[in-house]
Amino acid sequence: AAPYVIFGAKVPPHWLAIGTILTVVGGIYGPKAFSSPAAAAPAATPAAAPSSEPELDVEKAINDFLASDKKE
């Protein structure tokens, strides 16, 4: 295979493939390897307080819609 010309230098395709693989692997595992263990464990967040709004009951809403549709 013919080499690619990058910034005036001839680069063989296999070097581009190796560089791509190393960049992807380094991007995934690099931050994990260089972070401290304390920073890796996020602080526990408190559970969300229940809101004053009632939760949406989807099944009831669908049944109400179907019932009103049948009346028409």
UniProtKB/Swiss-Prot annotation:
Principal location: mitochondrion
One Pfam family recorded for the sequence: ATP19
Cellular localisation: Mitochondrion inner membrane
Keyword Nucleotide-binding part of the UniProt annotation: no
Keyword Manganese among UniProt keywords: no
GO biological process terms on file: proton motive force-driven ATP synthesis; proton transmembrane transport
UniProt KW keywords: ATP synthesis, CF(0), Hydrogen ion transport, Ion transport, Membrane, Mitochondrion, Mitochondrion inner membrane, Transport
GO CC entries: mitochondrial inner membrane; proton-transporting ATP synthase complex
Function statement: Mitochondrial membrane ATP synthase (F(1)F(0) ATP synthase or Complex V) produces ATP from ADP in the presence of a proton gradient across the membrane which is generated by electron transport complexes of the respiratory chain. F-type ATP synthases consist of two structural domains, F(1) - containing the extramembraneous catalytic core, and F(0) - containing the membrane proton channel, linked together by a central stalk and a peripheral stalk.
Subunit structure: F-type ATP synthases have 2 components, the catalytic core F(1) and the membrane-embedded component F(0), linked together by a central stalk and a peripheral stalk. The central stalk, also called rotor shaft, is often seen as part of F(1). The peripheral stalk is seen as part of F(0). F(0) contains the membrane channel next to the rotor. F-type ATP synthases form dimers but each monomer functions independently in ATP generation.
Protein name: ATP synthase subunit L
Origin organism lineage: Eukaryota, Fungi, Dikarya, Ascomycota, Saccharomycotina
